[in-house]
Amino acid sequence: MKDLLKFLKAQTKTEEFDAIKIALASPDMIRSWSFGEVKKPETINYRTFKPERDGLFCARIFGPVKDYECLCGKYKRLKHRGVICEKCGVEVTQTKVRRERMGHIELACPTAHIWFLKSLPSRIGLLLDMPLRDIERVLYFESYVVIEGGMTNLERNQILTEEQYLDALEEFGDEFDAKMGAEAIQALLRNMDLEQECEQLREELNETNSETKRKKLTKRIKLLEAFVQSGNKPEWMILTVLPVLPPDLRPLVPLDGGRFATSDLNDLYRRVINRNNRLKRLLDLAAPDIIVRNEKRMLQEAVDALLDNGRRGRAITGSNKRPLKSLADMIKGKQGRFRQNLLGKRVDYSGRSVITVGPYLRLHQCGLPKKMALELFKPFIYGKLELRGLATTIKAAKKMVEREEAVVWDILDEVIREHPVLLNRAPTLHRLGIQAFEPVLIEGKAIQLHPLVCAAYNADFDGDQMAVHVPLTLEAQLEARALMMSTNNILSPANGEPIIVPSQDVVLGLYYMTRDSVNAKGEGMVLTGPKEAERIYRAGLASLHARVKVRITEYEKDDNGEFVAKTSLKDTTVGRAILWMIVPKGLPFSIVNQALGKKAISKMLNTCYRILGLKPTVIFADQTMYTGFAYAARSGASVGIDDMVIPEKKYEIISEAEAEVAEIQEQFQSGLVTAGERYNKVIDIWAAANDRVSKAMMDNLQTETVINRDGQEEQQVSFNSIYMMADSGARGSAAQIRQLAGMRGLMAKPDGSIIETPITANFREGLNVLQYFISTHGARKGLADTALKTANSGYLTRRLVDVAQDLVVTEDDCGTLEGITMTPVIEGGDVKEPLRDRVLGRVTAEDVLKPGTADILVPRNTLLHEHWCDLLEANSVDSVKVRSVVSCDTDFGVCAHCYGRDLARGHLINKGEAIGVIAAQSIGEPGTQLTMRTFHIGGAASRAAAESSIQVKNKGSIKLSNAKSVVNSSGKLVITSRNTELKLIDEFGRTKESYKVPYGAVMAKGDGEQVAGGETVANWDPHTMPVITEVSGFIRFTDMIDGQTITRQTDELTGLSSLVVLDSAERTAGGKDLRPALKIVDAQGNDVLIPGTDMPAQYFLPGKAIVQLEDGVQISSGDTLARIPQESGGTKDITGGLPRVADLFEARRPKEPAILAEISGIISFGKETKGKRRLVITPVDGSEPYEEMIPKWRQLNVFEGERVERGDVVSDGPEAPHDILRLRGVHAVTRYIVNEVQDVYRLQGVKINDKHIEVIVRQMLRKATIESAGSSDFLEGEQVEYSRVKIANRELEANGKVGATFSRDLLGITKASLATESFISAASFQETTRVLTEAAVAGKRDELRGLKENVIVGRLIPAGTGYAYHQDRMRRRAAGELPAAPQVSVEEASANLAELLNAGLGGSDND
C-alpha cells in the first residue's frame, strides 16, 4: 500500500524549477540524450507493420510499441519489466517512452545550423567578422577559406576562389591550410580565442571615434561576451550530430486502404539519412572530390530543410506540391506550438448554445437548459448517486442518468445549488467577457442571460451564442464566486463607472415613468406617500405623469454612519413617487425627481455604489430593471410613420440653399472664384442647410403645444415615441432622426471625398434611384470598414497585452517622491475633462495646499476618493501632483500607491493584481468602436482652421504664461514669445479656458485684466508671420541691395509698393553671401541694444519676407518691421481613430516632425548649403554651440538673435515622441502620449482612465541606453532593461563606486514586447526564430516573472490568486523548506501499482 501512495505522489510531482535556460547543445550532450543511432531511412515494414530495426521508428532505440511487450513477443507482461530481450534488443517497458526517448544521426561531415547562419544578423558571420555571402559560398562549396595562413601572405578568414586556391597551392605548397564546407567554418570557430578577441575589441573601441565602427564593435563584443559567459562554444553552431525527435511526436498513422498518413518530419529525416548514408559510402570508396562535394552540399541542404524549411532557397515540397513543415514551423505562427497549444488550450466540461433574454432572473443567475446541465454536471451526479447508494457502480449510475430517471433530476437540483458556472461570449475583449453565474434550470434549449450584463458581454439576442464552463475544483468554484460573479463586477475596469447599466427598454420605461405632463389627470393632488401614489395610479384616478405633491421620507447618513430620517412635502409626479419605493435608504430624493435618461440612471447607480456599497446596488439594479420593463410595457411606446414629423420649413431652406449654389456657379463661370473654392463653398452651403433642417425638425419634434389647467396654451416636452427614445438614450440619436425626418445630407465617395449634391430626401419621403445609388457607397464602405477594423483592433490588443503582460502590483509603496502634475483638460473654450475626473482614485505625491495659503488641504500619500475630490473642488484647486505608474520606483512590477484605486472595486489596488493586462484590455476593447478613417480636411473645416482671434466664452480674468511682450505705439500689448498660453481664470481661481497665442498677436487686454464673456482678447493675421521690433529708433537697411537681395513689388489693387527679400536660390552670385537685415539705430546713428542684453537690435530677414517700410523711417517698439508669408498647411490629412492609436503606441516618427531646439541658447544662422540652412544655437554660458542643418522648405518659427529653451519648437509639425523624451523628459512624453490617445477615444465618446495608458507608456520606457559605463559591467551604447541599470547603480553606489549614466529609450509596443527579458514570452509573440536564436547564443535564463511565461510552462500565474502561491514558494525556498522530490521514478511507481493491482485481482495464491 505504501508503494501505491508513493506512486500517486510521484504522478503529481512537478519538476521544481525557478528559471528556464536555453543554450546551444554540444555534440556530446546530444549523444547523451540519445538512446541509439538511427542508421536507416526505413520507417515500418509494410507487411507486418512492425518498425524496421535501426530505422526511424526502431523499437530498440525508442522503446516498445505495446505496453510491457518486446517486439518479437518473447517477453510479455509486467514481471519482465526492465528486461532487454536478447533476440530483438527491445526493453520491456511502457510504450509512452516512445514520446520521450530521442535518437541521433552521426553526420558524415559537419553541417551548419541554419538558424545561426541565416537568422539576421548572422551569428556565425558576426563572430568570424565575415560577410554572410562569403560564409555561404564556403558552406555551399563555391570558395575556399584560409584557416591557417602559416608563413605565407594569406590571412586567416580570407576567401579564395578555386583558381586562387590552385595558384596558392602551386606557390606555397602545404604551408597554408584552406578548406571549404562546414568543416572549414567549424575549424575557424574552434580556433577562436574568445577572451583574447574581447580584450582586443575593447581596446579598439576605446581608440576609435567613428560612430558606425563603434556600433559594429559593440555588437561583436556583446556576442563574444555572451559566448564567454554562457559557456557555449562557437563550434557548436556547426552540427556534427543531429538529434532525432521521439517517434510518437512525429507519428505514422495507417489509414484505411493500406495508405499511411505521416508527419512531414519523417520525410525530412529520411532525406537527411539517405544523403548521409550515401555520403558515408562515397567517402569509403574515396570518390572524386567533386562528387563528394556535391553530396556534402546536398546533406547541408537536407539538414537546413529539416531545421527550417524555406529559410534558404526554395522550400522542399512533398508529393502534393506543399512545402514540408519543418521543426521551426512547428513552433512559430498562430498554428505553432506556442500559440496553438501552450497559450490556448481546449476546455473540458463546456457546452455552447444560443442565448435569449431572462428578464425575470436575478443579477447573479443565468438560465441553464436542463439537457445541458445534466451533461455538464455528470461527474457530480454520478458521485451523488453512488454516495446515496442509489447506484452501486459508476456504470449503473451512468445507466440511470441515460434513462433520465426522476431521482436524477432531484440530484441535479442539489448538485447545481450554489455551484457557479462561467459564461463566456466570443470575442472575449476584456475580462468581463467571462463572468460567473448561479445556474437556474430551465426547459428549452437556449441559455437565458440577465439583460443587465449584456453591455459587459456586448451581447444581443439576434442569434448570439455563448459557452458555459463548469469550474470543477473547490478552488475554482471559490474564485468564480468571489472574483468572477456578475454581482462583483458592477464597475468597468476601464473607467470605474458602472457597467451594469440599464439600456434600451428599461431606460425607456424609467424615462416614461419619470416624465411630467401639463394638465394630466390628477394634477395638483396632495398625497401622503409613494404607497398612496401607486394606489391612485392603479385605480386610474391619476396619470403617471401628473404633477402632484407627495410626502417623502429621505434617509441621510450622519457622521457616525447612522441613517437619519427627514420627511418633507415634495413637488413631483406620480411616476417618480412610485419609483422612489425601490430606491434604497440613504439616497436623496432629488436623484429620481427628474426625467431619468440613460446618463442620469448610470449616475444614480454610481452614487448608490459609492454611498451604500455593493449589495444594495445589486438589488437596486435588479429592481430598476424589473420596474423599467413593466412601465415600458405600459407606456405602449411604438414607432409609426407619423412619428417622423417633417418640418414645414424644410422645403424653404432647401430652395434657399439651391439658389445660393446657383449663384456661386455663376460666379465660377464668370471666373470670380476657382473650382476649388466653388466646391468648398457648395459643400459649406449644404452642410449649413442640413444643420438648419435638422434644427427645425428637432424643434418641431421636441415640443408640443398643450392647454394647461387655466385654459392657456403652453409648450411642453413632446411625448413623440421616436423623440422619447432618442432623448432618454434608449435607442437612436438626433443624427438618425435627422435621416428619418430631415434630410440625409451630404454623402462621401468611396475615396472619402464629399459628393457636392446632397441627398435632400429623407427615409420617410423615400429616395429616388440616384440618391439610393449614392447611399450605397457609404453602406458598403461601412461593412468593409467593420471587417478590417475588427482585425486591426484585435491585433492592437494582442500587441498591448504582450507588452504589458508582466506588469503586476508587487509592493505596497515604493516611497518615491516623483509624480505627474494633473490639470484639467481644456481645449479652447471648453473644459473637456475636469480635474476631478483626472485625479479621482489617484494618490497625492505631495501635500496639496489651499490656494493662496500655506495650509495643507490634502496630505501626501492620500488616496483621493469622491469626498477628497469634493474638497478640492470646493477650494478650487487647479493642479494636483499625483503618483503615477510611470514614475514608480519598484524594480519589477509597480507599487499600489503609484497605481491608486482599483477601478473595478473602488479601493486601493491589491498586491498581485495584473494591471498590465487590465490596461491592455481597457485600451483594446473599445478599439472596434474607433474609426479607421483618415480625415481629409476640406470645406468648412479648412477655413475654420485659420483662426485669427481669441474670443473668450466666460467672464473672468486673463492670465498669460511664458509670455514676452512689448507695448506698441497705440498702447496695446504685442506678444513676442513663441509658446504663449492664455488662460481664463474664474473668480475661484480655476482655469476655465486655455488658448495658444501666436507670435505677433495684438492683445486687447493685458495680463490680469478682467474680461466679460464673448469679448475678443487677441487678434492676429493668420496668413503671415510678423517680425516685431522690441525697441524704438530709426530703420537702417543693411545688405538690402535692389536686384541682388531684394526686389520691389507694387500691388495692383492698392498701388502700394513693398520690398520683397529674394530667396538665396533666386539671388545673383554677388548676393549669395549677403544677409539682408533691418538694423535699428538712434538719432545719432548708433546701434540700439535689445533691452536686457548687450546685443544690437538688428533683425535678419529670411527669403520671401515683405518689408513695407523705407530706409531711415522712425519706428516705435511693437511695430511690425516685415511680414513673412505663411504657406497655409493646405489640406493635410489627419490620421484619426485606430491607426492613430497604433501609431502612438508604436512610437512611430511622423513624416515631417517638428524640429525642437536641442539646447537652450541664442539662435543664429550659419553658412547655407544648396538645399539647407544651418541653424546655430549658442548657449548663454559659453559652452559648445549646437549646429543643425534644416531643409529650406521647412518654415522656421524663430529669428536670428532670439533666445530659445531646450525642447522649444523651432519649426512646426507633429512632434516626435522620441524628441519629446530626449529634450523634455519622461513626464512630458507621458503627458503627450496620454493626451493624444485620449483625444482619439474622447472623439468617439469612450472613457478610459489615464492610468491604463500610463501603464503602457511605462512598458514602452522599459529600456535605457548606457551613455557611460562608470564602474559597471555595461557597454557604452548598449541597450539594457531600465530596472537592471537601476539595481546595478544602487549596488555600485552602496559600495561607493561610480554608477553608469544612461538615457531612457522609448520603444514601440512591438519592439518592447520583443525586447523583453523573457525569451519565452518574446518567442511566443512574433519572430520566434530570431528570438530563440538570440537567446540560445547568449545562453539566456528566463526567470519566469511574467504571466505568459508561466502559462507556457504550465504553472499558476504570478498574479491574482497565483501571486500568493508564488510568494509562498519563494519564501519557503529562501527558508530552505522545500523538500527534495521523492526518489521514485514514475515508471517504477506505475509498475509497483500494476503489480499491486495484479496481486489484488487474484494474482497471488497465499491469501
UniProtKB/Swiss-Prot annotation:
Which EC class is the enzyme in? transferase
Give the source's domain of life in one word.
Answer: Bacteria
| A GO cellular component annotation in the UniProt record | DNA-directed RNA polymerase complex
Which cysteines are cross-linked by disulfides? none
Q: Which residues form the signal peptide?
A: none
Q: Where does Zn(2+) 2 bind?
A: C814, C888, C895, C898
Task: Report the record's Gene Ontology biological process terms.
Answer: DNA-templated transcription
Cofactor(s) listed in the protein's UniProt record: Mg(2+); Zn(2+)
EC number(s) from the headed UniProt entry: 2.7.7.6
Question: Residues that bind Zn(2+) 1, according to the entry?
Answer: C70, C72, C85, C88
InterPro entries, alphabetized = DNA-dir_RpoC_beta_prime, DNA-dir_RpoC_beta_prime_bact, RNA_pol_asu, RNA_pol_N, RNA_pol_Rpb1_1, RNA_pol_Rpb1_3, RNA_pol_Rpb1_3_sf, RNA_pol_Rpb1_4
Q: How is the cofactor bound?
A: Binds 1 Mg(2+) ion per subunit. Binds 2 Zn(2+) ions per subunit.
Query: What HAMAP family is this protein classified in?
Result: RNApol_bact_RpoC
Report the sequence similarity comment from the record: Belongs to the RNA polymerase beta' chain family.
Q: What does this protein do?
A: DNA-dependent RNA polymerase catalyzes the transcription of DNA into RNA using the four ribonucleoside triphosphates as substrates.
Subunit composition and interactions = The RNAP catalytic core consists of 2 alpha, 1 beta, 1 beta' and 1 omega subunit. When a sigma factor is associated with the core the holoenzyme is formed, which can initiate transcription.
Q: What is this protein called?
A: DNA-directed RNA polymerase subunit beta'
Encoding gene (name): rpoC
